[in-house]
From Swiss-Prot:
Single GO term (MF): 4 iron, 4 sulfur cluster binding
Keywords from the UniProt entry: 4Fe-4S, Iron, Iron-sulfur, Lyase, Metal-binding, S-adenosyl-L-methionine, Thiamine biosynthesis, Zinc
GO cellular component: cytosol
The protein's enzyme class: lyase
Organism: Myxococcus xanthus (strain DK1622)
Superkingdom of origin: Bacteria
EC number: 4.1.99.17
Protein name (Swiss-Prot/TrEMBL): Phosphomethylpyrimidine synthase
Role summary: Catalyzes the synthesis of the hydroxymethylpyrimidine phosphate (HMP-P) moiety of thiamine from aminoimidazole ribotide (AIR) in a radical S-adenosyl-L-methionine (SAM)-dependent reaction.
Assigned protein family: Belongs to the ThiC family.
Protein's GO biological process: thiamine biosynthetic process; thiamine diphosphate biosynthetic process
Length: 624
C-alpha cells in the first residue's frame, strides 16, 4: 500500500490501513477562487527531474516543469491534512450552503426508518457519532444547482469545478491534436459562466446534496473531462463498515470521481453514514436496494410509502444522486421475454417483478413528480436507471432498451420542470459497431442530459477480463459523448471485487476516460502524455513511473528485469537492451548532428551513407 495509514474503530473493531499519503513525486496544490476568493481547489502536482544535456559529469541540465493533473483523492493525499475518520472530513461547503439562506436545519431525522435506527440501542457501537442535524429547503425554496444556474447565479460550486477542469494547462494547449468532438461544444478555457450555462441547459450536473458538505464539487457533462464511477458495497455474505470506508478511500486514491454504495447486506444505513461523512466525492445509491431489504427481499411487498421514506432517509444522510428505475414500464416487460439474457439489471428486475405481481404500472413512474419534489428540497440528482439494459451483445439496441430510453427522455423533461438535475444511465453489452447509435439516440431523446454508461462490454467471451472488454466500449462511447463511465472490474459476472480488483477497474477506466478526452480534443488533455513521452525519450525513468496512472506497477514491472538503482538512469530498458534501443539510436543521431553543426536529416543521411560503405567494403553479402 502507498503512503501512511490511519485506523478506524467501529463497534470495537479496528481497521488498519486507510490509504494516506501522496503518490510518488506528487504534492497537493490549491488554486484560489476569483469570484469566491475563499475557494481552495485541489490539483495534484507531479514534479519532474531535469533533462541532462549530454553525458558525463560536466553535462548541463535543463529543468522540466511540474505537471498538474485532476485530483479526486480529497484530503487523504495531503500530508498536511489532519484527519479523524470518527469525526469525518471538514465541512467544506457548509458556509456556502448557509450563506444562500434558503435551507433550514431539522431538529432530527424525519424518516421513520432513520428514527428507528437512532432509537435502537443495539446499534450504538456502529453509529457515526458526530452527525450534523440534516438540512432541508425552506418552504417554497428550491436549492438545486440547476435552479441557481437558471436564475443566472454562479455558485461557489460552479467556480470550483471550472477551476478544477482547467488544470492550469493553458501553456500546453499548443502541443495538442485538435480532436473530433462529435458536435460537443468544448471551449478552450472553461469559465464559471460556461459551467453555469451548461448546467442551466441540462447538459451538465454538479451532484451535491446540501447534507453532504464534505463534498469537493465536481461536474458531469459532455463538454467536460470524462468522469468515472466506482461501485462499492457490502452483501449478505461479505464485507463490513470498515472495509467499505477503505474501499471508498482506495477508489478515489486511484481516480474515481464518484462512488456508488450498492450495499445489500446488513447495516446499510450505518455503512452509508460512515462513507458519506468521510467522502470528498459524490456518493450515489440505488434506493430500491435498501427498500427491498426492508421487506425481506420480497419485491411484491414493496410500497410507495416505504420507498418514499427510504428516499427521505437517504436525502437527509447526504446521498448526492439516486439511480431510480422509473422507466421500467409494465408494457415493456413482455418485450424482454425473447431476449437471450432477459432483464439483467437488479433494480430493473425488482420493478418488473413488482409490476407483474400487481399488474400495475411502476410506482416510481406514477409517483415521479412526488420524487422530484423530494429531491429538489435537498439537491439530489437523478441518475435515471436503465433497468432494461442489454445483458448480452445479442440483446443490444433492442425494442425494450430503446423503449425505456424514450421514457427516460420523458421523465427528464418532468425533472427539469422542477429544476432537478438529471443524468441518464446506459448500457450494458453492445458490440462496437452499435455503440454510436446509443449515444446518438440518447442525445436526441434526452435533450443532451449527461449520459452515464456501464462500459459497454463489447464481447461476452472473456469472464475474468471484462474490465478490458468493457474498457474498449467505454473509450469509444466516452469519445462519442458519454459524460461518466461506470467501472467494471475483473470480477464482473464472477464475484465481489476486492481491493486489487477495485484498483484494476478504476485504472482501466481512467485509461478509457483519458483516451476519450484526447480523442475529443479536451483542452490540456494531452499535456500529461507529452510529458511522459518526453521523459521516455530522455530515459528519465523516475519521471516515467511518476507520471503514469499507476506508478507502483510501472516501477515494479521495470524492476522485475532491471532491479538495480543504476538501471533507473540507464539509456535502455530490458525490451531492446543497450544496443538496439530505437530512442537511444535517435539520440545518438541528434548528438552527431549537434557536433557536426548539421540538421537531424543530414546527420541521418550521413550515418546511412557510412553504413552503406561498410556493407559494400565487406563484400555486399547479406549473411556472413
Amino acid at each position: 500500500m502507498s503512503g501512511a495509514s490511519r485506523s478506524l474503530k467501529v463497534d470495537g473493531k479496528v481497521l488498519e490501513g486507510i490509504s494516506r499519503g501522496p503518490l510518488p513525486a506528487s504534492r497537493k496544490v490549491y488554486v484560489p477562487g476569483v469570484l469566491h476568493p475563499d475557494l481552495r481547489v485541489p490539483l495534484r502536482e507531479i514534479s519532474q527531474t531535469p533533462t541532462r544535456l549530454g553525458h558525463g559529469p560536466d553535462a548541463k541540465e535543463t529543468a522540466n516543469p511540474p505537471v498538474h493533473v485532476y485530483d479526486s483523492s480529497g484530503p487523504y493525499t495531503d500530508p498536511a491534512a489532519e484527519l479523524d475518520l470518527r469525526q469525518g472530513l471538514p465541512a467544506l461547503r457548509e458556509s456556502w450552503i448557509l450563506g444562500r439562506n434558503d435551507t433550514e436545519a431539522l431538529s432530527g431525522v424525519s424518516s421513520e426508518y432513520g428514527r428507528a435506527r437512532e432509537a435502537d440501542p443495539r446499534l450504538a457501537g456502529l453509529r457515526f457519532a458526530h452527525r450534523r442535524s440534516p438540512r432541508v429547503a425552506k418552504s417554497g425554496a428550491n436549492v438545486t444547482q440547476l435552479h441557481y444556474a437558471r436564475k443566472g447565479i454562479i455558485t461557489p460550486e460552479m467556480e470550483y469545478v471550472a477551476l478544477r477542469e482547467n488544470l492550469q494547462v493553458e501553456a500546453s494547449l499548443a502541443a495538442q491534436h485538435p480532436g473530433q468532438s462529435w458536435g460537443a461544444a468544448i471551449p478552450r478555457v472553461i469559465t464559471p459562466e460556461f459551467v453555469r450555462d451548461e448546467i442551466a441547459r441540462g447538459r451538465a450536473i454538479i451532484p451535491a446534496n446540501i447534507n453532504h458538505p464534505e463534498l469537493e464539487p465536481m461536474i458531469i457533462g459532455r463538454n467536460f473531462l470524462v468522469k468515472i464511477n466506482a461501485n462499492i458495497g457490502n452483501s449478505a455474505v461479505t464485507s463490513s463498515i470498515e472495509e467499505e470506508v477503505e474501499k471508498m478511500v482506495w477508489s478515489i486514491r486511484w481516480g474515481a470521481d464518484t462512488v456508488m454504495d450498492l450495499s445489500t447486506g446488513r447495516n446499510i444505513h450505518e455503512t452509508r453514514e460512515w462513507i458519506l461523512r468521510n467522502a470528498p466525492v459524490p456518493i450515489g445509491t440505488v434506493p430500491i436496494y435498501q427498500a427491498l431489504e426492508k421487506v425481506g427481499g420480497k419485491a411484491e411487498d414493496l410500497t410507495w410509502e416505504l420507498y418514499r421514506d427510504t428516499l427521505i432517509e437517504q436525502c437527509e444522510q447526504g446521498v448526492d444522486y439516486f439511480t431510480i428505475h422509473a422507466g421500467v414500464l409494465l408494457r415493456y416487460v413482455p418485450w424482454t421475454a425473447k431476449r437471450l439474457t432477459g432483464i439483467v439489471s437488479r433494480g430493473g428486475s425488482i420493478m418488473a417483478k413488482w409490476c407483474l405481481a400487481h399488474h400495475r404500472e411502476n410506482f416510481l413512474y406514477t409517483h415521479f413528480e412526488e420524487i422530484c419534489e423530494i429531491m429538489k428540497a435537498y439537491d439530489v440528482s437523478f441518475s435515471l436507471g436503465d433497468g432494461l439494459r442489454p445483458g448480452s451483445i445479442a440483446d443490444a439496441n433492442d425494442a425494450a432498451q430503446f423503449g425505456e430510453l424514450e421514457t427516460l427522455g420523458e421523465l427528464t423533461q418532468i425533472a427539469w420542470k422542477h429544476d432537478v438535475q438529471v443524468m441518464i444511465e446506459g448500457p450494458g453489452h453492445v458490440p462496437m459497431h452499435l455503440i454510436q447509435e446509443n449515444m446518438t439516440k440518447q442525445l436526441a431523446v434526452c435533450g443532451e442530459a449527461p449520459f452515464y454508461t456501464l462500459g459497454p462490454l463489447t464481447t461476452d467471451i472473456a469472464p475474468g477480463y471484462d474490465h478490458f472488454t468493457s474498457g474498449i466500449g467505454a473509450a469509444m462511447i466516452g469519445w462519442f459523448g458519454t459524460a461518466m463511465l461506470c467501472y467494471v472490474t475483473p470480477k464482473e459476472h464472477l464475484g465481489l471485487p476486492d481491493r486489487d480488483d477495485v484498483k484494476e477497474g478504476v485504472i482501466t477506466y481512467k485509461i478509457a476516460a483519458h483516451a476519450a478526452d484526447l480523442a475529443k480534443g479536451h483542452p490540456g488533455a494531452q499535456a500529461r502524455d507529452n510529458a511522459l513521452s518526453k521523459a521516455r525519450f530522455e530515459f528519465r525513468w523516475e519521471d516515467q513511473f511518476n507520471l503514469s496512472l499507476d506508478p507502483e506497477r510501472a516501477r515494479a514491472f521495470h524492476d522485475e528485469t532491471l532491479p538495480a538503482e543504476g538501471a533507473k538512469v540507464a539509456h535502455f530498458c530490458s525490451m531492446c537492451g543497450p544496443q538496439f534501443c530505437s530512442m537511444k539510436i535517435t539520440q545518438e543521431v541528434r548528438d552527431f548532428a549537434a557536433k557536426q553543426g548539421v540538421s537531424d536529416d543530414t546527420a541521418l543521411q550521413s550515418a546511412l551513407d557510412e553504413k552503406s560503405a561498410e556493407f559494400k567494403k565487406a563484400g555486399s553479402q547479406l549473411y556472413r
